[in-house]
Structure formats: C-alpha cells, structure tokens
Amino acid sequence: MLTAIDYLTKKGWKISSDPRTYDGYPKNYGYRNYHENGINYDEFCGGYHRAFDVYSNETNDVPAVTSGTVIEANDYGNFGGTFVIRDANDNDWIYGHLQRGSMRFVVGDKVNQGDIIGLQGNSNYYDNPMSVHLHLQLRPKDAKKDEKSQVCSGLAMEKYDITNLNAKQDKSKNGSVKELKHIYSNHIKGNKITAPKPSIQGVVIHNDYGSMTPSQYLPWLYARENNGTHVNGWASVYANRNEVLWYHPTDYVEWHCGNQWANANLIGFEVCESYPGRISDKLFLENEEATLKVAADVMKSYGLPVNRNTVRLHNEFFGTSCPHRSWDLHVGKGEPYTTTNINKMKDYFIKRIKHYYDGGKLEVSKAATIKQSDVKQEVKKQEAKQIVKATDWKQNKDGIWYKAEHASFTVTAPEGIITRYKGPWTGHPQAGVLQKGQTIKYDEVQKFDGHVWVSWETFEGETVYMPVRTWDAKTGKVGKLWGEIK
C-alpha cells in the first residue's frame, strides 16, 4: 500500500499537522480547532481540519500525488491558491495555500502523478499570517455540493491507497479550456471609492477604446485615483482573453455610463484592447468572449435573467460610440445608433452570455501569460505620465489656442453645460450634458469659437470638450465662469 503521505515524505516533505495526532482520532477524525495569535484557523469547519499539512525546505515545487483531471485552479479559492485534481476513483485531491499565479495547469487539463502543479506558499482566503506549507486534503466523491461540505469534507488519506492511481494521461488537449487569470485590486477587500448600489439590475458591456491589458489597467487606475482623474470614469471589471481585473466590488456604484441610474444599478464590464488596429479582430473577439463569460458568471451569481432589460449598452445612456469595435463587427461599420441596431447588438451579447450562463466552456487560443511588473513602480510611472504641467498658449493649424492645465471643474450653471466630441466647437456632435454639481478633471484648455473650453479623456479613450465661459477673440476678454475651478 502506498499513501499520498508516503509518496510525499519519500520526496523529502515533512508533516507539520497530522490528523492521526489530534484528540479523538480516529473516531472524531480531523478535529484540531487550531488557534494562534487570536485566530481560529479551523473556525469555518467547526474546528475540523480533515487534511494533512506538509512542508519542504528543499523545494517549493508541489508534485501531483495522483494522476487525474484538473477541476479547479483558482488563485483566490477557499484555500488561497487552490488546485484540485479528480483521481480515477472520482475523489478530489485539494492542494491548498499555493503561491498565487504559480499554477501550471488549467481546468480540464490532464495531470500525471509527479507533475509539478504549482508552488508551495502561504496564501489563504482571509490573508491571515501563516507559515509556508502545503495543505493536502482528499474530498470524497459523495460530498454534498454546499460550500461547507466541499471545503470541510475529508477522507482519511493515510488509509487511501494510491498505488494504482498513476495511469499516464493523454495531455494532448491540455489548455483547450481557458482558465482566466484573476487580478484583484485593493478595493475588493479594502477601502471603497463609492457607496453600495441600491440594486443590481443588469450589466453594461463596454469597449475600452484602449490598448492596455487588465494587468496594465491596475496601476493606471491607481494612478488616476492618486491624481484625482478617476472621477472621469471607471468600471468594476476589465477583461481580455488572458486576465480579469476585479477593480471595484460589483455591488458598489461605478462611474461608467455618464448616467446616474446606470452607474447606480448596472455593473460595467470592459472588453480590453479594443483600440482599432491594436490587435486582430480574431484576438479581439476572444477578448469579447472572455468578458461575456465573466459577465455570465456575475449575472448568475446575482440571479439575474439574461434579456434586453438586463444586458445593456453604453450608447443607450450616453452619446458615445461605445461599444465601438463590437458594434463594427456585429452590427456593421458606420451603422446608425437606431433602436433596431441597438437591439441587434444586445441580442448578440445576450446569445453569447446565455451560452456561458447555461454552462458553455470558454475556448480560446493559448496565449502567453502576461507578466506583471511591480505594481508600485508601475503606479509611479503612470503618475508621471499623467501629470500635466502648465505651459504657455500655443495655436494649432486650425486656429485653436490651447495649453496644458491640470485642474477640476464643477458646473454651477443651472441648466448644465453641453459637451462635444471631436473638438472645441459648438457645431461638433454632442457628447452629453454635464449637470449642475457634477465635477470633472481636465488636462487641457482651449480658446476657440467664442468660448474658453476644457477637455479631458474619458475612461474609454474618447476626448470630450466643454465650454466654460465666453471669450472675445479680438479683445481677449472673457465672461463669467460657468462653474468653479480648483
């Protein structure tokens, strides 16, 4: 007989927590009730720890103790970095506390006994302090499906023979089912930017009109918070074919639609890298599919149906081209924003969301994992890029005077101020209306068309222009400001 513990100890692993040494063994299997520094590490399972803790001082490489199929590979699972392999007997081997980002396989992959599945670590659900080690647990195939049973059930692996659970697996199709890398900002567990939403009534599928990946968005968004430009907009979720950034809790108000009701009741999902020419249409569609899969998971978690009332577009609430690239591909380039076309776009999103809502798997090409640099350093770089220094006025070829200026503007005009796309001219298409009391952060000032204007870039990459007072080009005299500048 060969047990998993025998297998690991022969490789030099040492046991740090052994159920055979707990009080009441074997009758009261796994009752440990371990406390340290005021923390009960077994509280969730009622004091039980039906698992072995082992560690190695020689290597962090964690080998699979049996062959099988990966059914979970989650950086933020119930045991922190959580990896689960189902063996030939249909029982599940749980490898817990792995280093986040270290897992070598994705859900659906085949694994052979001895394959390195990840790295020994100390991650955990609550981010409590703990020593580096491996939590190894054998969940029975007949465990109930509720969370507590899935987390707390455990067979006595010291009595479980793995001698014949080492059959070679066909790994030729590994990687065909995509498991996205999840990135979490400090706001998920820490401080929040806004208040809780009064209700969750649906989702909005955006295109970011940018070229950044989700991991690149995180330092960029932090930098905007630091310099105050985050008030110009952000969404809760950013996704592409490789990664998902959970920037802010989905049940908190977002600034993603330029519409008070939509911001307070709808969850924003950004399809990343949508800037024309940044990536091929094929790769963009993979980004779109990944985003719709995440949207389906979130909608299902809130018990939302999938229909035209719950799947919405940005251009339903604000004068914008968003979702511009999805629109070009599924409705047609240059097609007008009519009700018929809006419904055509929504119906496409609905069809794909339903596919994932009903259990469809995400299948995309295997792309290289994007390496994340130190976020603090990236924040500093992004802040440096976003700082705008005051300069003297310059004039461009169209006769527009402009200069860089970094400040905030709060509207005081009772009727609000109409904003424009394309440039500082009242004849350009209307972008929207900034209402009394609303504030934006701008980075440039222009003088043209009888007005002084300010402009800023939205979180979707579009520049918006707004007149803030009158201006006489002949005398240089300016009128009363229609708001407050700080």
Swiss-Prot record:
Q: Kindly give the Gene3D superfamilies that the UniProt entry links to this protein.
A: Glucose Permease (Domain IIA) (2.70.70.10), Peptidoglycan recognition protein-like (3.40.80.10), SH3 Domains (2.30.30.40)
Show the disulfide pairing: C45-C152
Q: Which positions does UniProt annotate for Zn(2+) 1 binding?
A: H49, D53, H135
One Pfam family of this protein, by short name?
Amidase_2
Location of the SH3b domain:
406-474
UniProt: Zn(2+) 2 binding residues: H206, H314, C322
Q: Answer yes or no on keyword Nucleus.
A: no
Boundaries of every N-acetylmuramoyl-L-alanine amidase domain copy: 199-324
GO terms of molecular function: metal ion binding; metalloendopeptidase activity; N-acetylmuramoyl-L-alanine amidase activity
What keywords tag this UniProt record?
A: Antimicrobial, Bacteriolytic enzyme, Disulfide bond, Hydrolase, Metal-binding, Protease, Repeat, Zinc
Q: Which GO terms describe its biological process?
A: defense response to bacterium; peptidoglycan catabolic process; proteolysis; symbiont-mediated cytolysis of host cell
InterPro entries referenced in this protein's UniProt entry, alphabetically: Amidase/PGRP_sf, Amidase_domain, Cell_wall_metabolism_enzyme, Dup_hybrid_motif, Peptidase_M23, SH3-like_bac-type
Region span, 14 X 13 AA tandem repeats of A-E-V-E-T-S-K-[AP]-P-V-E-N-T: 67-247
Cofactor(s), by name: Zn(2+)
Q: What is its EC number?
A: 3.5.1.28
Give me the sequence repeat coordinates as residue ranges.
67-79, 80-92, 96-108, 109-122, 123-135, 136-148, 149-161, 162-174, 175-187, 188-200, 201-208, 209-221, 222-234, 235-247
Q: What class of enzyme is it?
A: hydrolase
Q: What reaction does this catalyse? A: Hydrolyzes the link between N-acetylmuramoyl residues and L-amino acid residues in certain cell-wall glycopeptides
What's noted on cofactor binding?
Zn(2+) is required for amidase activity.
The similarity comment for this entry is:
Belongs to the N-acetylmuramoyl-L-alanine amidase 2 family.
Q: What does this protein do?
A: Endolysin that degrades host peptidoglycans and participates in the sequential events which lead to the programmed host cell lysis releasing the mature viral particles. The N-acetyl-muramidase activity cleaves between N-acetylmuramic acid and N-acetylglucosamine bonds.
Tell me the domain comment. Contains a M23 peptidase domain at the N-terminus, a central amidase domain and a SH3b cell wall-binding domain at the C-terminus. The CHAP domain contains a tightly bound structural Ca(2+) ion and it is present at the N-terminus and is associated with the endopeptidase activity. The SH3b domain increases the amidase domain activity. The amidase domain confers most of the lytic activity.
> What's the protein here called?
Endolysin 2638A
Its organism's taxonomic lineage begins at: Viruses, Duplodnaviria, Heunggongvirae, Uroviricota, Caudoviricetes
